[in-house]
A protein has these predicted regions:
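Sec-dependent signal peptide recognition
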Residues: 2-10
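Exposed boundary/loop context
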Residues: 11-12, 70
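C-terminal motif of bacterial Sec signal peptides marking the signal peptidase cleavage site
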Residues: 15-18
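A detector of low-complexity, intrinsically disordered, Ser/Thr/Gly/Pro/Ala-rich segments
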Residues: 10-11, 22
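Proteolytic cleavage junctions
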Residues: 22-79, 85-96, 104-111, 116-361
Length: 361
């Protein structure tokens, strides 16, 4: 196991501002502006979340006319073809003014980390062909689809020998209902969004994306707006699996009490696979030196090569370590594989560079 530690003294001070605790969907959706009752992250978690938000993938905006068929191309080279008349007001009428189309794409390990959108289902990693979100508005009012948007995406990772790629639904937001009374003391209810902890819960959708030999793209359709869709295939790993426990030497003890952002985090990037797994489970009742995270039980393939990224924000300072590793089998008489981390102080820019380096692993 080879440790790649990037360590330099912190030379940059970052001002802490109010952290946007909304998920990506909520930030794009003006109807989700009801404050959700949830635990508050600590100051270090806010500092880390602020950095991730500033360095993460950005929304791209396009102006179109609803009565015309139009194809827009993002800076990532992906094409979205909107049929004429496909965009409608919620009452079914056709928009008459210019339409703003907002598109967000999460495509690489760096994006997966900075957007808190790991590519895993029940802790098992998925080979990702990207995550996509589209919103359309007229004068600020959300529109709906009367016909699907055709999407052609550039294939940026290895192609598995299969005819179709499963589509997935998932988000960092869950919705719950509060029952109460309105201004006339009549029973009523309100549906409110809240950030889901822990993170994404990807569920397989009934449709698929198809490889297009003519264009060299992966093609699929979006039948709804304001909904994340993910193109993923199963990892296909076979053989024995283990539970990985990651021990942090620098750990923020407020991590179990901070939600949805956390001041300590652990990620695993499988070697040469466009995927990132986030370890959400916290080691409980740990003695000094053994605080940290563990994977789902018996989920990480023994012999899997990859890179861990351990991160902690503590007292306004960032600490991190990149660690290349091959997942070992549990020692005799145990049912887990331990990995110890030696986190070093890093600046904000150094941390972002370490996250970006996952794209090359």
């Amino acid at each position: 196991m080879k440790s790649l530690v990037r360590a330099l003294a912190l030379v940059t001070t970052i001002a802490v501002v109010s952290c946007n605790k909304q998920s990506t969907v909520e930030k794009l959706n003006p109807e989700s502006n009801i404050a959700a009752a949830e635990a508050q992250p600590n100051r270090d978690a806010q500092l880390l979340a602020q950095l991730f938000a500033s360095a993460g993938p950005k929304t791209q905006f396009f102006t179109v006319q609803g009565k015309e068929k139009v194809t827009v191309t993002t800076t990532n080279g992906n094409k979205y073809t909107i049929p004429a008349g496909a965009l409608r007001r919620k009452d079914g009428s056709a928009p008459t003014g210019p339409i703003s189309v907002a598109i967000r794409e999460v495509l690489s390990p760096k994006d997966f980390v900075l957007s808190n959108r790991p590519t895993a289902a029940a802790g098992a990693y998925l080979l990702s062909y990207g995550e996509y979100f589209v919103r359309a508005t007229e004068a600020g009012a959300d529109l709906v689809l009367a016909a699907p948007i055709a999407v052609q995406t550039v294939v940026r990772t290895q192609v598995r020998p299969q005819e179709k790629v499963p589509m997935w639904d998932g988000d960092t937001t869950v919705y719950y209902t509060i029952n109460g009374y309105n201004q006339l003391n009549q029973p009523t209810s309100v549906t409110q969004p809240a950030s889901q902890d822990p993170g994404i819960n990807w569920t397989q959708a009934p449709d698929y994306a198809l490889f297009n030999a003519t264009t060299g793209t992966l093609d699929f359709q979006l039948s709804q707006l304001l909904q994340w869709r993910n193109c993923d295939v199963f990892s296909g790993s076979t053989g024995p699996k283990t539970t990985v426990l990651g021990y942090f030497d620098v750990y923020n003890n407020d991590t179990p009490n901070s939600s949805p952002e956390q001041p300590s985090m652990l990620f695993f990037k499988p070697r040469n696979i466009n995927s990132v797994v986030k370890f959400f489970n916290i080691i409980l009742n740990a003695p000094a030196g053994f605080n940290g995270f563990l994977s789902y039980q018996s989920i990480i393939p023994v012999g899997q090569q990859g890179t861990f990224l351990a991160i902690t924000a503590l007292n306004g300072q960032f600490y991190a370590q990149l660690l290349d590793a091959t997942i070992a089998a549990p020692a005799s008489g145990t049912n887990y594989t331990p990995v110890s981390f030696n986190l070093q102080p890093v600046s904000a820019s150094q941390l972002v560079s370490m996250i970006a380096d996952l794209n090359n692993r």
